[in-house]
């Protein structure tokens, strides 16, 4: 990991700031979420939502999507140049749910994008506040990560569905900037690069001309982002090879897939942030909380605190379990889709189940679903402890990489060993160590073989009582090793259809 001096913290990325001290970061992150909260309150007024309707997570998501759509310049330009029948490129909207005569009814609203942009800027001191938009994108991405498995997308790019723990942020839009890049998993970056290389193989002009030069710059930038996520010299050296290739093709795809597999044990450094739905920030602002003055952090106690006293509702389908719906949203709020379930369970204070055992579908309701049978229920988003979010893959103190269970990318900086089935992973590495990356491949395989499942990661790091805001008394939990730790283990979650 590079020393902190050369890297902006991800709150700085998040707020587009230069190097700032801790208080300035807390203030600028506070300003960002405060702006989201003010915007949400204003939208509730525009839409004439009651208090309860404003606390409905489905309404929050619709409002968030409207503002993201209003600021999506590339798509707006495309829509204006390719008008489709029945769609006004200058308008945006979605389903808003209201309580009428003891039932929830769906109403489709439409607004001018210009009007939404005006309300957003007004809530953010007249600025575009791109950081706040990215924050909403990351919340949607975390929700997707907890809800869907990306098996199909993995198979399409020639990767193994068992690599799903590397897919954090796979549904983030391209325009999500540095903060978005920080939360993307190794598998997500590999997949983006493979798609790019495949286009280059199929389309002769992809790398040529003025456009091709821009494409090449984007390719090298993505390679550097991925390289920065790896924590061992051999993995980074292989990324240099991929980046410097004159004409990227199958050899590079092979190398990238090899690197993705290696990341199951030699894990990459991927940032985690607790991004909450807009209505949560709205509730806090409405109750008089001044985020900018108080300061806020996405990786400390603040989001836990906020969720302790926020009441958020969700629509529930007839055969869904409200407790399971709550777990899904809790995991999304803390970006914990790929965390070890033992750690999540300890922090939440209730058992966190694997995805396949949850009786719940996604949070959003499709337009053809019957509203007559919909109920609503309060989401239980509180926790027993809090823990610092990590941006490292959790390696031991020596630069020898520690082991990672297939399907874990730690979210919380909490001491644990990372059990994994080495045989399963190593089986994927038979043979192919020839070619220009042979020495690096051999070195990576050697490191993987030497990593022991019983190695402890995040030594001495623990969870904290919710009263311990300065994180002075770490409680180091002991875990029952017999429990399966991965969320998408042996799973049947729905696919995410992009």
Curated annotation (Swiss-Prot):
Localisation: Virion; Host nucleus
Motif (Unconventional nuclear localization signal): 1-18
Post-translational modification as stated in the protein's UniProt record: Late in virus-infected cells, may be cleaved from a 56-kDa protein to a 53-kDa protein by a cellular caspase. This cleavage might be a marker for the onset of apoptosis in infected cells or have a specific function in virus host interaction.
Gene Ontology annotations of biological process type: symbiont entry into host cell; viral penetration into host nucleus
Main location as per UniProt: virion
Keywords: Capsid protein, Helical capsid protein, Host nucleus, Host-virus interaction, Ribonucleoprotein, RNA-binding, Viral nucleoprotein, Viral penetration into host nucleus, Virion, Virus entry into host cell
Function: Encapsidates the negative strand viral RNA, protecting it from nucleases. The encapsidated genomic RNA is termed the ribonucleoprotein (RNP) and serves as template for transcription and replication. The RNP needs to be localized in the host nucleus to start an infectious cycle, but is too large to diffuse through the nuclear pore complex. NP comprises at least 2 nuclear localization signals that are responsible for the active RNP import into the nucleus through cellular importin alpha/beta pathway.
Assembly information from the UniProt record: Homomultimerizes to form the nucleocapsid. May bind host exportin-1/XPO1. Binds to viral genomic RNA. Protein-RNA contacts are mediated by a combination of electrostatic interactions between positively charged residues and the phosphate backbone and planar interactions between aromatic side chains and bases.
Protein name per UniProt: Nucleoprotein
Organism of origin: Influenza A virus (strain A/Gull/Maryland/704/1977 H13N6)
């Amino acid at each position: 990991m590079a020393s902190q001096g050369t890297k902006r913290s991800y709150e700085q990325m998040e707020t587009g700031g230069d190097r700032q001290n801790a208080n300035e970061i807390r203030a600028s992150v506070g300003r960002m979420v405060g702006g989201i909260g003010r915007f949400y309150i204003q939208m509730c007024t525009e839409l004439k939502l009651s208090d309860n309707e404003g606390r409905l997570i489905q309404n929050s998501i619709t409002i968030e999507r409207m503002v993201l759509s209003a600021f999506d310049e590339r798509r707006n330009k495309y829509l204006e140049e390719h008008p489709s029948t029945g769609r006004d490129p200058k308008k945006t909207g979605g389903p808003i749910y209201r309580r009428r005569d003891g039932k929830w009814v769906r109403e489709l609203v439409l607004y001018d994008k210009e009007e939404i942009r005006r309300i957003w800027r007004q809530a953010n001191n007249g600025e575009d506040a791109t950081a706040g938009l990215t924050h909403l994108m990351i919340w949607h991405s975390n929700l997707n990560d907890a809800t869907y498995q990306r098996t199909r997308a993995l198979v399409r790019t020639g990767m193994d569905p068992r690599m799903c723990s590397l897919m954090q942020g796979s549904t983030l839009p391209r325009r999500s900037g540095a903060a978005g890049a920080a939360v993307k998993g190794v598998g997500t970056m590999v997949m983006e690069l493979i798609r790019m290389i495949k286009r280059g193989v199929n389309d002769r002009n992809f790398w040529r001309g003025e456009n091709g030069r821009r494409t090449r710059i984007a390719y090298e930038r993505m390679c550097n982002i991925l390289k920065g996520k790896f924590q061992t010299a051999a993995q980074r050296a292989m990324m240099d090879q991929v980046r410097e290739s004159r004409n990227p093709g199958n050899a590079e795809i092979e190398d990238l897939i090899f690197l993705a597999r290696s990341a199951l044990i030699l894990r990459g450094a991927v940032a985690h942030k607790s991004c909450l739905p807009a209505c949560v920030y709205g509730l806090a602002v409405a109750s008089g909380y001044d985020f900018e003055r108080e300061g806020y952090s996405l990786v400390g106690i603040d989001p836990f605190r906020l969720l302790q006293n926020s009441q958020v509702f969700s629509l529930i389908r007839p055969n869904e379990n409200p407790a399971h719906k709550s777990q899904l949203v809790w995991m999304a709020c803390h970006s914990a889709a790929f965390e070890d379930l033992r750690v999540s369970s300890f922090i939440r204070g209730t058992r966190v189940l694997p995805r396949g055992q949850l009786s719940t579908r996604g949070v959003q309701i499709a337009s053809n679903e019957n509203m007559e049978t919909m109920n609503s229920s309060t989401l239980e988003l509180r926790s027993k402890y809090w823990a610092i979010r990590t941006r490292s893959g959790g390696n031991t103190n020596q630069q020898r990489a520690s082991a990672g269970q297939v399907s874990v990318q730690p979210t919380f900086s909490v001491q644990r060993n990372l059990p994994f089935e080495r045989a399963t992973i190593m089986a994927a590495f038979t043979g192919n160590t020839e070619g220009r990356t042979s020495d690096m491949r051999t070195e990576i395989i050697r490191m993987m073989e030497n990593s022991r499942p019983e190695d402890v990661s995040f030594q001495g790091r623990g969870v904290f009582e919710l009263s311990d805001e300065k994180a002075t008394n770490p409680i180091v939990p002991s875990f029952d090793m017999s429990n399966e730790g991965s969320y998408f283990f042996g799973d049947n979650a729905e696919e995410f259809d992009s």
